[in-house]
């Protein structure tokens, strides 16, 4: 009986279970200690950053607007914050020099206290982070560039004695219109029995007569010539 109990206690399954439990406790302790250390370090960094930043001393308008804004908010609880912030500015402009004098005196007193507390203080405004500009061009700019490249390469040809300048797109469209009109006229006079055969033969003859068809780009030929 005693041997059986000892075998159960020292069996491989029990030993493995005990080791996994012990390892889990140790890892949890390590993670807890790391989180505590990280929190302490973050707290120290926040304190150091808060100590480095020193607020500017208040001027006369800020001294007056702080008190006045509180009074306006208490008198008008339903007023929005944007309207509450505008109200002290309007009233400050209406005040006379005698009405502004006590607030200027209070601002001078606060400035003297600030200079005694921070003798080497210099105002350094925080710079706003610049947004990264998109280095890749937009799709609309690419399309505009392609259209300008296609339309801004004119060529000249002679028709008798006159010289005329056309862009590639204009010349191709004009020739396509003349070709389609001639096809329609010839097909109108043809018989219904030989309509399919005449369409193919006329198209091949017309395309052979015009050499510019060979210089067309694949995208234009597929778009304008479905045969």
From Swiss-Prot:
InterPro entries the UniProt entry points to: HMG_box_dom, HMG_box_dom_sf, SRY, SRY-related_HMG-box_TF-like
UniProt xrefs under Pfam families: HMG_box (PF00505)
One GO CC term on file: cytoplasm
Compartments in which it is found: Nucleus speckle; Cytoplasm; Nucleus
SMART domains (UniProt xref): HMG
Matching SUPFAM superfamilies: HMG-box
UniProt keyword annotations, A-Z: Activator, Calmodulin-binding, Cytoplasm, Differentiation, DNA-binding, Nucleus, Repressor, Sexual differentiation, Transcription, Transcription regulation
Main location: nucleus
GO molecular function: calmodulin binding; DNA-binding transcription activator activity, RNA polymerase II-specific; RNA polymerase II cis-regulatory region sequence-specific DNA binding
PROSITE patterns: HMG_BOX_2
Superkingdom, taxonomy of origin: Eukaryota
A biological process from GO: sex differentiation
DNA-binding stretch(es), residue numbering of this chain: 54-122
Job of this protein: Transcriptional regulator that controls a genetic switch in male development. It is necessary and sufficient for initiating male sex determination by directing the development of supporting cell precursors (pre-Sertoli cells) as Sertoli rather than granulosa cells. Involved in different aspects of gene regulation including promoter activation or repression. Binds to the DNA consensus sequence 5'-[AT]AACAA[AT]-3'. SRY HMG box recognizes DNA by partial intercalation in the minor groove and promotes DNA bending. Also involved in pre-mRNA splicing.
Family, as annotated: Belongs to the SRY family.
Quaternary organization: Interacts with CALM, EP300, HDAC3, KPNB1, ZNF208 isoform KRAB-O, PARP1, SLC9A3R2 and WT1. The interaction with EP300 modulates its DNA-binding activity. The interaction with KPNB1 is sensitive to dissociation by Ran in the GTP-bound form. Interaction with PARP1 impaired its DNA-binding activity.
Protein's name in the database: Sex-determining region Y protein
């Amino acid at each position: 009986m005693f041997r059986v109990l000892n075998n159960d206690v020292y069996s491989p399954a029990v030993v493995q279970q005990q080791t996994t439990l012990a390892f889990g406790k140790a890892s949890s302790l390590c993670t807890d200690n790391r989180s505590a250390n990280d929190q302490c370090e973050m707290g120290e960094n926040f304190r150091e950053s808060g100590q480095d930043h020193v607020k500017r001393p208040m001027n006369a308008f800020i001294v007056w607007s702080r008190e006045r804004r509180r009074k306006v908010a208490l008198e008008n609880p339903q007023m929005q914050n944007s309207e509450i912030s505008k109200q002290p500015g309007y009233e400050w402009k209406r005040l006379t020099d005698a009405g502004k004098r006590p607030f200027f005196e209070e601002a001078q007193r606060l400035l003297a206290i600030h200079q005694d507390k921070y003798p080497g203080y210099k105002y350094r405004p925080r710079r706003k982070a610049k947004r990264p500009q998109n280095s890749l061009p937009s799709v609309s700019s690419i399309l505009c560039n392609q259209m300008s490249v296609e339309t801004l390469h004119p060529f000249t040809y002679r028709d008798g004695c006159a010289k005329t300048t056309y862009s590639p797109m204009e010349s191709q469209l004009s020739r396509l219109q003349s070709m389609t009109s001639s096809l329609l006229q010839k097909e109108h006079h043809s018989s219904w029995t030989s309509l399919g055969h005449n369409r193919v033969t006329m198209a091949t003859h017309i395309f052979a007569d015009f050499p510019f068809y060979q210089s067309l780009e694949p995208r234009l030929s597929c778009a304008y010539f479905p045969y």
